[in-house]
Amino acid sequence: MFDSTLNPLWQRYILAVQEEVKPALGCTEPISLALAAAVAAAELEGPVERVEAWVSPNLMKNGLGVTVPGTGMVGLPIAAALGALGGNANAGLEVLKDATAQAISDAKALLAAGKVSVKIQEPCDEILFSRAKVWNGEKWACVTIVGGHTNIVHIETHNGVVFTQQACVTEGEQESPLTVLSRTTLAEILKFVNEVPFAAIRFILDSAKLNCALSQEGLSGNWGLHIGATLEKQCARGLLAKDLSSSIVIRTSAASDARMGGATLPAMSNSGSGNQGITATMPVVVVAEHFGADDERLARALMLSHLSAIYIHNQLPRLSALCAATTAAMGAAAGMAWLVDGRYETISMAISSMIGDVSGMICDGASNSCAMKVSTSASAAWKAVLMALDDTAVTGNEGIVAHDVEQSIANLCALASHSMQQTDRQIIEIMASKAR
């Protein structure tokens, strides 16, 4: 719990980070459906015999090609089945952390028997939507999640409505901590990072602990596309230099390899995404280690990275056609620039160069190849920092980048929020045609 005597704005920053930076086991879109199924199963009278689920097109996109931890299988059906048969309804994004070998076997058997179906919800105006309905004979329970990966808005059984969330904030309720980010600036975030007591932000070191463990697993195992392990081998062969730049890419992509390959270790997520959490964490950790930073400097750099990533992502839809590893890496660029230089000008220049570099990267669903995009984003972030240290950056005379970094961020987010909606529909259409 943080010090209540802190500046109220700083309290809201800390609350925003605590809300958005959480442990998550498995890719968060399938996990969101697994959570809905687990909560529904907890409400059901008797064991689950059948599972029906409906998801938004975006959630379907991000669930088609990703491995569910511990199962060796990809896709939403196994996530729904395992959530229903082995999920911990009280564990949030770690819903599958207690799944046993027997539960996994039972989930696969349920799937093989044709007792699990997952369809796109039509019509669906929500970007993030999952609904799971579980059956025992004629008895059933249904749970709906909307807007956020763990935001349960409705629980119903054959006996009637158990819970429904109010659509709006009523008088006397506090607004979401994220709301304050729409009224803040990067300069204010930097002031907070520089001046907040270390004790109030020490908790962010947990992101380094979790994501470093995931990175180590990625280097030691044959996970996903094993990009990190492959690049490390090429260093040993002399085909790639073993330096700070390659270490950033190797250790960051290794964590994503393990994450997307189905390792049973949690990631510390950011904005509902494990890969965003990895991208906001690992480059900063590697640079901090290179410079021998102590825990306090690491915590401040991680707080700047994670809060900047949240600040940018708060201007985006929760899921979109824009690969959000890029925006998380903008946070990482801020954190790395702070470690090396500390000046606002260096941080803002690095972010501007990132927007001029990787802003066109699309999200074509969660899969092993996400680690490729994570590695690209991490590399671009360090390149942008190196440019900024030499007083060089993409300027407001070029493309969507503006002279002011805040406007550059707004321009990027406007593209993702509006113009790229058709891109998203085309991506989903292509992926759906492959699945048929």
Curated annotation (Swiss-Prot):
GO MF annotation, one: L-cysteine desulfhydrase activity
InterPro entries linked: Ser_deHydtase-like_asu (IPR005130), UPF0597 (IPR021144)
A GO biological process held by the record: L-cysteine catabolic process to pyruvate
Domain of life from the UniProt record: Bacteria
HAMAP family from the UniProt entry: UPF0597
Similarity comment: family membership: Belongs to the UPF0597 family.
PANTHER family reported in the protein's UniProt record: UPF0597 PROTEIN YHAM (PTHR30501:SF2)
Name used for this protein in its record: UPF0597 protein YhaM
Organism: Escherichia coli O1:K1 / APEC
